[in-house]
Amino acid sequence: MVDYFDYNSLLTRAREQLPEEVFKDVRFEIPSADSFVEGNRTIIKNFKDIAKFMERDPQEFAKYVMKELGTAGDMEGVRLILQGKFGWRMVNEKIQNYVNEYVLCPECGKPDTKIVKEGRIHFLKCTACGAMKPVKTL
């Protein structure tokens, strides 16, 4: 039997037919928090926009940020109001920690994930590669 195509030429041909987005690594960049201190409170003006960008529930995301900062707070429209003075850098660091723990897939690094509950355990399930990782309940 004659082999008309060798493996490398088939692989090259298949890769050429894939869209450019598949090969890009910088497709997911979180918008930085637009925060300021007003009196003894810190206000994040674009909090709901950040949660929507990550495709996460704003209430659960707010709960995580408040827990990590060790403070109380409240959602007011699209803003999150935190009790206490927190710098821009600290707020963005907590947001990035949330992204690393609850948004990005640990296997492929893509943000195409959902938090699913199976039994009593919450999992981070990747829709891109199918990987599942147990995560802490908020």
Curated annotation (Swiss-Prot):
The keyword Transmembrane appears for this protein: no
Gene3D superfamilies assigned to the protein according to its UniProt record, in alphabetical order: 3.30.30.170
GO terms for MF: translation initiation factor activity
The keyword Membrane belongs to this UniProt entry's keyword annotation: no
Organism domain of life: Archaea
Any coiled-coil regions, as ranges: none
Alphabetized InterPro entries for the sequence: IF2/IF5, TIF2_bsu_arc, Transl_init_fac_IF2/IF5_dom, Transl_init_fac_IF2/IF5_N, Transl_init_fac_IF2/IF5_Zn-bd
Keywords per UniProt: Initiation factor, Protein biosynthesis
UniProt cross-references to HAMAP family, sorted A to Z: eIF_2_beta
Complexes and interactors: Heterotrimer composed of an alpha, a beta and a gamma chain.
Family: Belongs to the eIF-2-beta/eIF-5 family.
Known role: eIF-2 functions in the early steps of protein synthesis by forming a ternary complex with GTP and initiator tRNA.
Stated name of the protein: Translation initiation factor 2 subunit beta
Primary gene name: eif2b
